Each structure stands twice: as structure tokens, then as C-alpha cells.
Amino acid sequence: MYFVFSVLITVTLLISAPAYAKPLTFSVEQVFVDEDNHDLRRVGELEFISGISVTSDNKRFGGLSDLHVNPDGQMIAITDKGNRLAAQLVFDRHGSLVGLTNGDITKLQTPKGKKLKGKKKSDAEGLTRTKDGWFVSFEHKQRIWFFPGTDPAVVAATKISPPKGLKDMPANGGLESLVELVDGRLLTFSEDLENAPSQTQGWLRTGKAWENIYLSRS
């Protein structure tokens, strides 16, 4: 006989805003590999530790595209609405993720220091941390920006010279993934642009120079 249960945690997160601002409230629900067997932890080579489903009635929340977790457990995420979400991950004594605290959600800034507006200009998809700041890739209006410092939401973006071929990507199938490699090079892949059938277009940036690379999909 199986017992199905869920743990619902409501966490009130106070954002850095005036006292009259509405608190950012999350509902956090534990998720499992198998809702009928919560002890199932391994699927093939994958070991599942823990997971949560996060919702909020705040209209700014949602559409998380990519995230980075600092060694101290602080999460920095970007959304397809051009927001940066920061929150502290909460773990129980067994090391399972159970909640979020200290949340803040703020619009990213353009190179002119203005907050992003409009879906086509705000669809952030890829995020990667470097020793000097953050690279963020965008769809629709295809581009990569750099945000110096420890928080991408408090500084104006810096434009990055893009690789050739960005205009060939579908509006909603652009630079979906972005990562800085251990040697400092920047790697990015398109979601839908193909060089050949089952061969996804990507680019590798060394210094300020881009080169084409391709990922074959089986």
C-alpha cells in the first residue's frame, strides 16, 4: 500500500523595496521521481537527491530560464521576462532542498542603464558566472550581454560582439545555453539552428574571437 503526500511550504520573502511593497510569497512543494514510491532515488546513472516545485502569485515570478548557485547556497536565476531572481536555498539536516528565503526579483538593465521592457527584448535564456561578472544570452532579439560584479541586476549591461549567424536563428530558438569553460572560453549553443540535419550550431569564444562549432545529436 502506498501513501502519497506532499509537503507544502509557504515562504514569505521580503524584497529590498519600500515598506509598502507587497511581499514576494512562494509556495514550495516537494517533488519526487515517483509519487507512489518516495524512496526511489536512482534512475539509470542518475541519483535523485531532492527537488521542489515553486509557484507564486506575484506576476513578476515565473519563466526561469537558467540559474547559478553560489557556494553559500544563494541562487541567482534569470527569467524569460528579463528579471533576475535571487534567493537563498534552504536544506534540511539530510541535505534535501526544502525551501527558499531572502528572495528578490529585479529587472535586468540595458547598456544605457534602463530596465528591460517588452518580451522580444527581455527573453533571457542563458546565464554563466565568471570571476568578473555574468554573461547572459537572449532570444528573439539575439544577443549576449555582460554584467560586471556579483549581482547582474544592479549594474548596466555591456554589449558583447556577437558571433556571425545570430540573425539566422529562429526568434524563439536562439541562444538557449551558455557556459564559461574552465579555461575561460565561452561556449554557447542555439536551440533550433542546425548546420545539417541533427547537427546543432554553436560558437566558442576565445578572447574576443568566435569560431563555429557543431553538436551532433543521435
Segments and roles (model prediction):
Residues 17-218:
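Sequence/structural signature of beta-propeller domains
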Residues 4-15:
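Bacterial N-terminal signal peptides
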